[in-house]
Amino acid sequence: MGGGPRTFPGGLSKWQHKRMHEKLARHKERGLLRHEKQLYLARLRSEIRASRLPAAGASPPDDGDGPTSSRAHIRALADRFLLPGAEDLWNEDDGPIHRADRPRPPRRIVSVGGNGGDRRKLDSTKQELPRGGKEPRLAAFNPRRDFQTAAPWWWQWSSSSAIPSRTKEASFCFFGPKRSYSVMPLFQAHQESSGTSMVPLIARGLASARIAPSQLNGERFYSFAAGRFGRKLRPDSSDEDDEDISTAKKDMRFARFGASSEEESGYDELEARSAIRKKWSSAALRNCDMKKERRALKSYEEENNDLAGSFRELREEIKNREVLGAERRRYESRGESLFTNKRFEECGISPLTVKALTDAGYVQTTVVQETALPMCLEGKDVLVKAKTGTGKSAAFLLPAIESVLNAMKSHTNHRVSPIFSLILCPTRELAIQLTAEANVLLKYHQGIGVQSLIGGTRFKLDQRRLESDPCQILVATPGRLLDHIENKSSFSVRLMGLKLLVLDEADHLLDLGFRTDIEKIVDSLPRQRQTLLFSATIPKEVRRVSQLVLKRDHVFVDTVGLGAVETPTKVEQLYLVMPHELHFHMVYRLLREHIDQEVDYKVIVFCTTAMVTEFMYIMLRDLKLNVREIHSRKPQLYRTRISEEFRDSSRLILVTSDVSTRGVNYPGVTLVIQVGVPSDREHYIHRLGRTGREGKSGKGILLLAPWEEYFLNEIHDLPVQKSQTPNIDEEMKRKVDGSIKIVDMSIKEAAYHAWLGYYNSIGDVGRDKTMLVDLANRFCKSIGLEKPPALYRKTALKMGLKDVPGIRIRK
């Protein structure tokens, strides 16, 4: 048999071969189910049509409620694409158009004339009227005739000033290109006994002629005055021959496109017939191909109620803003104090939780806690905006614990242990931090557990941990939580008992990157729940999208205030503008200067991408600085270890990407350096918020290239000042260049590709591809590459850089 592993055709392994056949079996099963569904629908349609057929020997129903014909079915399908108010030129009695190359129809000779011998033959194809003062008898005309006309055409009486009468000789003229038509006659013959005959009355003749409405039984006509097309169904009558022209014009209408108020009474039968057609066409299609009905307009009372409710909500929001503004001014007058005079014992929370807070050193509430806790504990949906480092985590962890305690008091028996509180956060580091803080608050609570679900760990281990150690509070990232919901049915059952949903850093979770996952998660949660949203920045778009998870009567708590600065007031904000080739030299210069000034320094350096972060870390490490790195390319165990080390240490530098931007609490950070333009204003605020926490002082420096100065317009309302450019001596420049050279070539190429992708995604830079490639080539030289690395063809196509000069394509 051989000693190697067994393979199947195509080089597949045993498991690949098995999965392939399982996939083919599922595909075949879906096809059989689809075919069976089609047969069922066809049989159902046949039964519906058969049930509407008249019984054998019975007369067809007189209400026209029988099965639809093929012509009516096609007509109903075409009506679906007719826009409201458009004119329909469909004429069901029109036949096929005869082209010029077809033989002309034979002439029809009919007899016209009076009662005596004054009768002669009339050629119907020439459309002439006999001479002699007599009108033609139309009884001999066939119900269908073919003739040629000119288009455009109209009839012209021989004497335009005279009124045509029954004794007056009339003629009509044609001019224009010929067209062939096959139409039904406009008028049928009248009974000879009535002594009345008709001539076609159109254009000017209609204005003064008298007609008998009995001549118009079930036929089509055109009215210049009304401008409508339609079908008029009237009973035969000969008593109205002497009506005036207004009655005649009123009766001569086409009703295909509706009628005025005086016309509506005569079209009941036509509307009934149209309704029958639509009804049977939809039945044949089993309601699968119907137009969507327009939303009905609200009544006057409903509009007034909605308007009154909107005004009531607006008054409440204005009142809340005034209260919050007064409180904010009171705290500002006390000197920007973070804590208030209110103690946690006065907030109505569990004494065991208060005891745990006291042991941790927290006795008084902060501004956001004092404002948001009463509303959260009342069970309302709340959207909270507060500055970074003001105690938002405790403001939603305390209501989460209280919701679990209230749910456990009900003593309801559950088959599985339910999850009462769910906390979602965007990053793994933030989830780990919130889990640790929740464990501190649950120190004296017995029987309440908290766990975290984050990426970077084994899925089976998470399942085993959730089953062996059930929890009531779950902290998770959206991606890993969605994996458990979709792959583990028992986990979805546990979420059915949810009482509280919390979205920390809600603006980021409701952004385009996470919105799809959040929508799927919310769909799997019970609707009867409380939802809390917390963030330091809440743009207008997030306020609008927040309706996906919040109730309509939710409360918006803004502790920042309108027109207030969103960044910590004790943090000094500076920016530097330098050529991109000197950015790495300037970072080293700023770090050396800060280390000399601060004894217990603690610095965070934010880079644009993960690979640029790794490049910066290797360069600074070679320059003998005490530096660590965290970015998305590192395994989760490494990231957790470095995060804990940086949190508990001082005299340390952390080089990181945006994974450390939001929510992570690193106490005692003295300096934040942002290298390159942030992706948006919110990222700048959250990065800067890593320093100046809990009311302490700090410093932030933004390092930009000359072509990145556009970003200053987005933060013009923040107290950012331009700093004096420090000098870089030759010795320092030589040392940095030497450290750049020792970085591995693969890391440099990866940094170039990542830099190009990042700035290509920023609209202000990525619009001009030629300029973007030129800037990328400058960055390439700044990291020690002589020529830009080649891109894969697929990557260049995705980025829109395939034919841009300066881009090298890998062959």
Swiss-Prot record:
Domain of life: Eukaryota
Compositional bias per record (Basic residues), positions renumbered to this chain: 15-29
Pfam families in UniProt: DEAD, Helicase_C
Domain Helicase C-terminal residue range list: 570-740
Its EC number(s): 3.6.4.13
Renumbered residue ranges of the record's region Disordered: 1-32, 93-138
GO molecular function, one term: ATP binding
Group of enzyme by EC: hydrolase
Swiss-Prot/TrEMBL keywords: ATP-binding, Coiled coil, Helicase, Hydrolase, Nucleotide-binding, RNA-binding
Coiled coil: 286-333
Residue ranges, compositional bias (Basic and acidic residues): 95-104, 117-138
Residues spanned by motif Q motif: 342-370
Domain comment as written in the entry: The Q motif is unique to and characteristic of the DEAD box family of RNA helicases and controls ATP binding and hydrolysis.
Protein name: DEAD-box ATP-dependent RNA helicase 48
Source organism of the structure: Oryza sativa subsp. japonica (Rice)
